[in-house]
């Protein structure tokens, strides 16, 4: 019996533990979920909840109407955000194997930043210290995440451009970084497994480009 329970732990057959929380580190039901959310006591991965704000979702004019932000501007804003968060966390806490940002719209996933460190102790220290910090005018909410294999967490239909659930899909829609930034960040140290897929639809990113004033205030 014990072997059977262990074999179904975190799967759809498990009637006690939430399979979505086990795979994705988040569940749309939150505390109201009928199944248990077993938060890890140690993990290589942390999640910074709702940290990234897509300007296409938040840009408004003074009268409350939405203003247009081009895809190129959004990618540049995102690359700046990704580079700053990745660089600062790696410099302060230790080597990062992988960092991913959700582009979903559901409250439990929107703007979540998942950072997988090489060492569990680095992840633990990051959670403790980051929960006392602010970023871009908002308090940082960090916790250890059960996610270690993002291949199990991602929406395969989204990656093929076929997801019919849109931004409210319950699997991760990971926003890609530009190819140039990927080489810049993941080429600094030993080759890491499964870095974020590069975005090839925009012009190459210039290194050391001047950041916008709003972005300079985003530091932890």
From Swiss-Prot:
Disulfide bond entries: none
Keywords for this protein: Acetylation, Cytoplasm, Metal-binding, mRNA processing, mRNA splicing, Nucleus, Repeat, RNA-binding, Spliceosome, Zinc, Zinc-finger
Modified residues (N-acetylalanine): 2
Residue intervals of the RRM domain: 65-147
UniProt subcellular location: Nucleus; Nucleus speckle; Cytoplasm
SMART domains tied to this protein: RRM (SM00360), RRM_1 (SM00361), ZnF_C3H1 (SM00356)
GO biological process, one term: mRNA splicing, via spliceosome
Sample GO molecular function, one term: zinc ion binding
InterPro entries, alphabetized: Nucleotide-bd_a/b_plait_sf (IPR012677), RBD_domain_sf (IPR035979), RRM_dom (IPR000504), RRM_dom_euk (IPR003954), U2AF_small (IPR009145), Znf_CCCH (IPR000571)
Pfam families the record matches: RRM_1, zf-CCCH
Chain residue ranges for the region called Disordered: 186-220
CC per GO annotation: cytoplasm; nuclear speck; spliceosomal complex; U2AF complex
Keyword Nucleus: yes
Residue spans of biased composition, Basic residues class: 189-220
ZnF (C3H1-type) ranges: 12-40, 149-176
Subunit structure comment from the entry: Interacts with GFI1, U2AF2 and C1QBP.
Function: RNA-binding protein that function as a pre-mRNA splicing factor. Plays a critical role in both constitutive and enhancer-dependent splicing by mediating protein-protein interactions and protein-RNA interactions required for accurate 3'-splice site selection. Acts by enhancing the binding of U2AF2 to weak pyrimidine tracts. Also participates in the regulation of alternative pre-mRNA splicing. Activates exon 5 skipping of PTPRC during T-cell activation; an event reversed by GFI1. Binds to RNA at the AG dinucleotide at the 3'-splice site. Shows a preference for AGC or AGA.
Entry's free-text remark on domains: The second zinc finger in necessary for interaction with GFI1 and for alternative pre-mRNA splicing events. The region 162-220 is essential for the nuclear import of the protein in spite of the absence of a nuclear localization signal (NLS). This region is essential for the interaction with C1QBP, interaction which is required for the nuclear translocation. This region may be involved in the localization in nuclear dot-like structures and it also confers the ability of nucleo-cytoplasmic shuttling.
Stated family: Belongs to the splicing factor SR family.
Name by which UniProt lists this protein: Splicing factor U2AF 26 kDa subunit
């Amino acid at each position: 019996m014990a072997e059977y329970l262990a074999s179904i732990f975190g799967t759809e057959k498990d009637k006690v533990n939430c399979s979505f929380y086990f795979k994705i580190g988040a569940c749309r039901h939150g505390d109201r979920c009928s199944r248990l959310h077993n938060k890890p006591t140690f993990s290589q991965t942390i999640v910074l909840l709702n940290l990234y704000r897509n300007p296409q979702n938040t840009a408004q004019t003074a009268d409350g109407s939405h203003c247009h932000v081009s895809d190129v501007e959004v990618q540049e804003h995102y690359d700046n955000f990704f580079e700053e968060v990745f660089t600062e966390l790696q410099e302060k806490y230790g080597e990062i194997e992988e960092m991913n940002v959700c582009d979903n719209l559901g409250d439990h996933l929107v703007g979540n930043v998942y950072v997988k460190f090489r060492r569990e102790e680095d992840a633990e220290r990051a959670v403790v210290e980051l929960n006392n910090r602010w970023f871009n005018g908002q308090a940082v909410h960090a916790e250890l995440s059960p996610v270690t294999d993002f291949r199990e967490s991602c929406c395969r239909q989204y990656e093929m451009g076929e997801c019919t659930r849109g931004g409210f899909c319950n699997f991760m829609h990971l926003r890609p970084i530009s190819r140039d930034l990927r080489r810049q960040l993941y080429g600094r140290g030993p080759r890491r497994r499964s870095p974020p897929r590069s975005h090839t639809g925009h012009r190459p990113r210039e290194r050391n480009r001047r950041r916008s004033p709003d972005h300079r205030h985003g530091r932890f």
